[in-house]
Curated annotation (Swiss-Prot):
The modification N6-acetyllysine is found at K98, K137. Residues 342-375 are annotated as: 17 X 2 AA tandem repeats of R-[ED]. Component of the spliceosome B complex. Interacts with SMU1. Interacts with MAD1L1. May interact with DHX15. This is Protein Red. Residues 42-53 have a biased composition (Low complexity). It comes from Pongo abelii. The gene is IK.
Amino acid sequence: MPERDSEPFSNPLAPDGHDVDDPHSFHQSKLTNEDFRKLLMTPRAAPTSAPPSKSRHHEMPREYNEDEDPAARRRKKKSYYAKLRQQEIERERELAEKYRDRAKERRDGVNKDYEETELISTTANYRAVGPTAEADKSAAEKRRQLIQESKFLGGDMEHTHLVKGLDFALLQKVRAEIASKEKEEEELMEKPQKETKKDEDPENKIEFKTRLGRNVYRMLFKSKAYERNELFLPGRMAYVVDLDDEYADTDIPTTLIRSKADCPTMEAQTTLTTNDIVISKLTQILSYLRQGTRNKKLKKKDKGKLEEKKPPEADMNIFEDIGDYVPSTTKTPRDKERERYRERERDRERDRDRDRERERERDRERERERDREREEEKKRHSYFEKPKVDDEPIDVDKGPGSAKELIKSINEKFAGSAGWEGTESLKKPEDKKQLGDFFGMSNSYAECYPATMDDMAVDSDEEVDYSKMDQGNKKGPLGRWDFDTQEEYSEYMNNKEALPKAAFQYGIKMSEGRKTRRFKETNDKAELDRQWKKISAIIEKRKKMEADGVEVKRPKY
């Protein structure tokens, strides 16, 4: 082995008597678990001789380093801290020699600084008139005792010269005061207990031989009369419920405690059984029957007869003793506040109604203005004006503003119908003239009876056909998803007709009805045709412009 740090190392040597020359015999003698147990159970033999000198791994190394030894380091540390402690004690001794404990001097009565002030305070305590020897002696003793107590305890907590938290004497004084107070309180608490024990002693001596005697004694002497609270009388507290209030359902119930004079007395409150209730009801019904027969009118045959004299008991009122109900005229402040609130609400409602009426009047005026403008536009239309295309939305005129306009609209509609022409051809010229006057509103009451001519023209015994009338659909209109295909839905929308209820109420029966919506079928071919027409129109327009000599922007392909 190579040497490290000039120290030779060697492999450990085998113990004495161990021979490993024959490896075959070593392999044959294998140890088992039993051999291992025996080895564990046999005690270790004491060494007969010293360990061999060749094994040097337990020896101290040649060069000993004191810093690496933990015991040496511990000793050094102890000596260092001992020196520090000694220096600290010496410093405290020096400070104690220079420091003067004035509080200790004051407690011992050796304080030189307060000698002059004590003389002044003691001379002020003496009286002007010389007292007797005994009084002087007792006063001096008391004064000396007070001085000593003030020196030791420091006087009262508020006026003491001791510092709270620094002087131990003040803490002792406060503790003594707290202990004395607690003792006094305990004595006060124990006094009534002792007195009650003294009172109970003679009673405890009583012995009862029977249960009956014990019960009699308890009922006579031990039963305590219950103190009645005058506030809790039967029927004194009642719930106040305002039936006129809008928020009566959610209002918090308020309680009212009535005065004793208003409360019903116990004598007045009679407990009625079921029989008494039935009897009272029967008497009430009989009294009603008597009053009803007396107030009936006499028949013709009984008019001449004199009224039979009734016994005085029949007219007696069973509720004679009960006085009439006198309502209180004064209202509570809460009722007054509610009345004011309701008045304010009524005024607001009136103002709102007025505003609504004004708005309606304005709307009516606007409608009349629009109707006049439409009439003027119709008059201005020329004969050769283009008809409206199907794609353009049709303006549905609103109802007429007055009865005259309603009659005019009826005349215009019926003048173009075939049935009306047939009836006109059958009539005489005089009737035509009268009818013209009738529709012209020259001399008739048609304004008051707007449906008169309508009833004359279309009156029949058959029932009116209400199949086309728009009676309203509670489930809502049919939509796209109520049909299987788009074609069925478009066919339904094209054929859908509905007449307003007003037409049936006023007697106007339209032949074809009104289509609710202009639903047009859109297919690819129609769309392509429309686009081709637009493109061809643009091309024609450009050709005309080129022919006229106008420069046209040419697209780049």
